[in-house]
A protein has these predicted regions:
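Conserved non-catalytic scaffold segment of RNase H-like nuclease domains
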Residues: 2-116
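Short, polar/flexible loop-turn hinges at active-site or ligand-entry regions and domain interfaces
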Residues: 71-76, 122-129, 182-188
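Acidic, Mg2+-coordinating catalytic module of metal-dependent nucleases/exonucleases
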Residues: 100-107, 111-112, 154-219
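Short alpha-helix plus adjacent loop in nuclease-associated cores
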Residues: 136-163
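A short, structured active-site edge motif that brings together acidic residues
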Residues: 45-50, 128-146
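Substrate-recognition/cap helix-loop segment adjacent to the acidic, metal-dependent catalytic center
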Residues: 108-136
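Conserved protein kinase catalytic core
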Residues: 18-20, 143, 200
Length: 219
């Protein structure tokens, strides 16, 4: 059971290159507790990747690049080198005593962050998150909570949110459409904005089952 005073790092990243070797150009995060809410919130654009036109040409959401520049200009996001992003996140984790990191489909975020770390340091440093932080996965949690939920099942079938094998889908966008009652909600696919909805999914899952095991890797 996660104590309501336990600090949690919720993060999301956007990537370029290919799915097997993703490089992070956008990372947003919140540090929060269930009792106190948001303690820290930041949005970074990785200058080492974002300023490389060849790498960014393959970004799935490359059409958002002009908006990123506008956000950087108005202070909504901070353009910073990867080394400094990692350093600041580590300092925030230490300052607030972060125990868990969480993402929706956390295995991808973990792989993308570590792949970028190895690329940027030529594998001198291999892991992005500070040692000792445990990964939680809201995708795993949502599957446990919603797999037998009749209302969510009906919502998926009525809107054709199904896999090729006819099973319910559990993307953050679909889950949040159901949670919010907003059928036309579209995920931003920018780091910090996606963090905000994924935190609500996390809190919903814990409200349904406080003892849920959301760990990405289990002992």
């Amino acid at each position: 059971m996660i104590d309501i005073h336990t600090p949690i790092l919720m993060l999301d990243c956007e990537t370029t290159n290919d799915i097997d070797c993703p490089f992070v150009y956008d990372v947003g995060y919140q540090i929060f507790t269930l009792a106190d809410g948001i303690l820290c919130e930041k949005s970074f654009v990785n200058a080492d990747i974002f300023l490389d036109p060849e790498l960014m040409a393959s970004a799935y959401f490359a059409d958002k690049i002009p908006q990123y520049w506008e956000d950087i200009k108005n202070g909504k996001r901070t353009l910073r080198k990867w080394f400094n992003i990692k350093k600041e996140l580590a300092e925030d984790c230490k300052r607030f005593g972060v125990v868990y990191a969480c993402a929706h489909n956390a295995s991808f975020d973990n792989r993308a962050l570590n792949t970028t770390q190895r690329y940027q340091t030529t594998s001198k440093f291999r892991y992005f998150l500070p040692y000792g932080i445990t990964w939680l996965d809201t995708l795993r949690m949502a599957r446990q909570i919603l797999k037998d939920n009749e209302d969510y099942g009906r919502f998926c079938y009525e809107n054709d949110y199904l896999t090729s094998r006819g099973c319910r889908r559990y993307t953050a966008e679909i889950i949040f459409r159901w949670l919010s009652g907003s059928a036309d909600f579209e995920e931003s696919h920018t780091g910090l904005e996606d963090v905000k909805i994924e935190r609500q999914i996390f809190e919903f899952c814990l409200a349904q089952e406080p003892n849920i095991d959301g760990r990405l890797w289990r002992d």
